[in-house]
């Protein structure tokens, strides 16, 4: 399994209406251990989340099912593989 840092930029006209469904989706990912942390940036221009997947293809499947992606609420997003090294939850 690999960790990925996903950063998003919101479509300002669409994201607020979709946010409840997006958060429900992320809550399910958190409950099954796939999602470590997520949240919006302080300026509400986008957000970031740290997510675990088998590989980039598996991550893409997860992202493709996110209501923000399905409903066009993102202008863009970037993905970088991330190697957690230190922190309270890193073992």
Please place each PLM-identified region on the residue numbering.
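Conserved, structured core segments of small domains
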Residues: 1-91
